[in-house]
């Protein structure tokens, strides 16, 4: 199951007819990320994210995706405590944009959507309204639209960055092993990392 499928349950295009009375209440925890073993990161985030978590590359050479490792076992997020509080210093933008996301239409246009199963959605007026009483986007929705738009732009930049890494043959297969308190050894395979020696020569 992909990272997006684990987070977004019921994605719907945002519009004033369906979401005219909907508000988004602030939820302090990140319970929606509980089952994520990794989270995609943008190239622009590498500096901030790398100081807090390991960044590796998954996927085929023509479709590489940089991700931050959050755990080793399936459905394990070690950065989330029992109270759903994030314990790391940096939260990837992939998580910060939730419950919003772009969906690509048949005509290749991008539509802003929301996960209607998000626990912070309200219809009682609490939280940030998506539309005002006249059916116009609120400043909050405009802010989130801008955030997701910038995310999408940086996603395209990241794709080109990964293609360049692959073309320069700077990536190499890697694995990770960890022993838990019970002495059980777990091994994570199927990803690549940057070959530092090759990287230093360019």
Placement of each model-derived feature along the sequence:
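Aromatic- and glycine-enriched beta-alpha-beta binding-site module
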Residues: 58, 65-131
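Short, basic/low-complexity N-terminal boundary segments at the transition from targeting/disordered tails
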Residues: 30-35, 73-84, 154-160
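Short small/polar-residue motifs
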Residues: 51-53, 96-100, 173-174
């Amino acid at each position: 199951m992909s990272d997006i499928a684990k987070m977004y349950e019921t994605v719907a295009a945002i519009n004033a007819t369906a979401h005219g009375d909907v508000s988004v209440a602030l939820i302090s925890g990140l319970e929606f990320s509980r089952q994520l073993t990794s989270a995609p990161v943008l190239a622009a985030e590498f500096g901030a994210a790398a100081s807090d978590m390991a960044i590796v590359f998954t996927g085929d050479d023509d479709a590489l995706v940089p991700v931050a490792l959050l755990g080793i076992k399936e459905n394990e997020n070690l950065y989330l405590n029992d109270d759903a509080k994030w314990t790391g210093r940096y939260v990837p933008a992939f998580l910060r944009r939730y419950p919003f996301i772009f969906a690509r239409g048949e005509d290749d246009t991008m539509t802003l959507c929301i996960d209607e199963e998000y626990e912070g959605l309200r219809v009682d007026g609490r939280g940030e309204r998506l539309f005002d009483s006249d059916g116009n986007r609120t400043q909050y929705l405009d802010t989130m639209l801008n955030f997701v738009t910038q995310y999408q732009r940086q996603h395209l930049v990241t794709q080109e960055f990964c293609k360049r890494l692959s073309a320069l043959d700077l990536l190499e297969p890697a694995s990770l092993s960890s022993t838990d308190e019970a002495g059980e050894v777990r091994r994570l395979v199927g990803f690549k990392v940057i070959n530092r020696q090759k990287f230093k020569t360019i």
